[in-house]
């Protein structure tokens, strides 16, 4: 599962409303992420624009929703928020340093790197705040990542010690 709290809440809301909600200003970019994955569809119902989730998907979501899914959503949310913060501060991080920092901050080893990368790739696409590149991860506002990487190499300074003071639930 690549869901974080924001995306989980939207799907939960749609599932709680029999698979359909009015399209109330959900950005086109965010809706496209769900549409590309064939989770949600746009339509018109009684003359009103709606987002629709097929009954089959609603049923699967409802049957899977529980403490295990909530735990995964919480973990994913933590990873995504930490990634946004780290890349806002550092700009660019190679995968080795990034993974080490994430494990240090969360106190958990990343057991499945493929799942980890899928979650972060999906979040990067959805939120547009960071991207996976040949060098690792970068903040989307960085135009010249080579320059940042070279600066990191020249500075020979350790990464600033972050803590996890935010409350994301």
What are the residue ranges of the model-derived segments?
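Intrinsically disordered or highly flexible coil/loop and linker segments, enriched in small
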Residues: 20, 40, 92-93, 126-129
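Short amphipathic alpha-helical interaction segments
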Residues: 21-46, 108-121
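Short amphipathic alpha-helical interface segments
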Residues: 2-28, 80-103
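Helix N-cap and loop-to-helix transition residues
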Residues: 4-5, 54, 94, 109-112
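Low-complexity, interaction-prone regions
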Residues: 10, 122-129
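Phosphate/pyrophosphate-recognition segments in soluble nucleotide-handling domains
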Residues: 1-7, 55-81
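Accessory beta->alpha helical hairpin/"wing" motif in late/C-terminal subdomains of nucleic-acid enzymes
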Residues: 41-69, 120, 129-153
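Phospho-regulated, low-complexity intrinsically disordered regions of nuclear gene-regulatory
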Residues: 72-86, 101-119, 136-169
């Amino acid at each position: 599962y690549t869901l974080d709290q924001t995306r989980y809440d939207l799907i939960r809301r749609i599932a709680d409303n029999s698979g359909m909600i009015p399209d109330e200003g959900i950005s086109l970019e965010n809706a496209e992420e769900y549409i590309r994955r064939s989770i949600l569809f746009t339509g018109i119902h009684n003359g009103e624009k709606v987002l629709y989730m097929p009954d089959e998907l609603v049923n699967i979501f409802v049957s899977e929703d529980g403490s295990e899914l909530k735990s995964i959503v919480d973990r994913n949310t933590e990873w995504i928020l930490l990634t946004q913060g780290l890349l806002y501060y550092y700009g660019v991080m190679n995968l080795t340093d990034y993974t080490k920092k994430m494990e240090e901050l969360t106190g958990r080893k990343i057991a499945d790197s493929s799942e980890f990368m899928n979650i972060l790739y999906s979040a990067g696409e959805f939120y547009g705040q960071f991207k996976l590149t040949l060098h690792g991860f970068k903040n989307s506002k960085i135009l010249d990542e080579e320059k940042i990487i070279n600066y990191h190499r020249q500075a020979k300074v350790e990464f600033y010690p972050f803590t996890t003071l935010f409350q994301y639930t």
